[in-house]
Amino acid sequence: MDEKGRSLKNNNMEDEMDLKRGPWTAEEDFKLMNYIATNGEGRWNSLSRCAGLQRTGKSCRLRWLNYLRPDVRRGNITLEEQLLILELHSRWGNRWSKIAQYLPGRTDNEIKNYWRTRVQKHAKQLKCDVNSQQFKDTMKYLWMPRLVERIQSASASSAAAATTTTTTTTGSAGTSSCITTSNNQFMNYDYNNNNMGQQFGVMSNNDYITPENSSVAVSPASDLTEYYSAPNPNPEYYSGQMGNSYYPDQNLVSSQLLPDNYFDYSGLLDEDLTAMQEQSNLSWFENINGAASSSDSLWNIGETDEEFWFLQQQQQFNNNGSF
């Protein structure tokens, strides 16, 4: 009997020495999934040997239930799931497997980890026991209603974002229509001006620049230069950039035809105009950036900090005996 017992003990020790520990490999995952797809779940100790895995039955079961099962959900626990966990835990306590039945795709181990890392952490920060009546009341009357508010707010934000997307799409189509109409009006205006010039004997140029045949982007400064015929401080630069573009002769423009509030741009070089524009843009950007920074600092509160603040306020309220 002693020899037989020793042989069985030695065999068990040899089996334990052959077992693998540590992370699973992709090859092991494939073997486990392939075997379960063919033979089903259950009898995990025999399943491990039949599948050719040097793992314990418990290791195979946990690997399948927590990671390889097709319906296992990934990612953070949602607000709705958090609310359901708090509600079910208030009824059944630490019965994680039973709670997991009401959260499809979530494992009992994942729910237990959420409870220990989030709920117990808040209780510790509030310096009270997680199983105390005070903390249970805090969850029931403050934390859970707060979750409901956040769920409703997130739903409203999603609906508003969907409405904004629809409006933006419609507005883009309208903008394209307006641009097309504007281009047509511009062409008609240019055609009428050429006809009027022919009637009154004024020279016209068929190479007049339009948005269609120009290779230079249109800007407000170029418009002012074209219509008011400012003196050219650098003739070589403008002649190289504008090519065959037409500029009216300055001698043909009489000072009597200019309006009284006409500003003489001849005294401003391109450097002055550029400096004025950059200063204006810089002031505008600083104002906007300053407002955004103050707003961000005001609302930059983490989710955990916000929840902890509410729970702390509730605890102070309870300590004063007004709860």
UniProtKB/Swiss-Prot annotation:
HTH myb-type domain span: 16-68, 69-123
Annotated signal sequence range: none
One Gene Ontology term of the molecular function aspect: DNA-binding transcription factor activity
Pfam family, one: Myb_DNA-binding
Induction: Up-regulated by jasmonate and pathogen infection.
GO cellular component, one term: nucleus
Keywords: Activator, DNA-binding, Nucleus, Plant defense, Repeat, Transcription, Transcription regulation, Ubl conjugation
CDD domains: SANT
Post-translational modification: Ubiquitinated in vitro by BOI.
Record SMART domains: SANT
Domain of life: Eukaryota
PROSITE patterns: HTH_MYB
DNA-binding region: 44-68, 96-119
Tissue specificity comment: Expressed specifically in flowers. Restricted to anthers in maturing flowers. Strongest expression in the vascular and connective tissue where the anther attaches to the filament. Not detected in pollen.
Cellular localization per UniProt: Nucleus
Knockout consequences: Reduced male fertility associated with delayed anther dehiscence, reduced pollen viability and decreased fecundity. Increased susceptibility to Botrytis infection. Myb24 and myb108 double mutant has a reduced fertility and a greatly reduced seed set relative to the myb108 parental allele.
GO biological-process terms attached to the record: cell death; defense response; positive regulation of anther dehiscence; response to fungus
PANTHER family assigned to the protein according to its UniProt record, in alphabetical order: MYB TRANSCRIPTION FACTOR-RELATED-RELATED (PTHR45675), TRANSCRIPTION FACTOR MYB108 (PTHR45675:SF45)
Protein function: Transcription factor contributing to the regulation of stamen maturation and male fertility in response to jasmonate signaling. Required for correct timing of anther dehiscence. Acts as a negative regulator of abscisic acid-induced cell death. Not involved in the regulation of BOI. Regulated by MYB21 and at a lower level by MYB24. Negatively regulated by the proteasome in an SCF(COI1) E3 ubiquitin-protein ligase complex-dependent manner.
Quaternary structure and interacting proteins, as annotated: Interacts with BOI, but not with BRG1.
Protein name according to UniProt: Transcription factor MYB108
Organism: Arabidopsis thaliana
High-level lineage: Eukaryota, Viridiplantae, Streptophyta, Embryophyta, Tracheophyta
Gene: MYB108
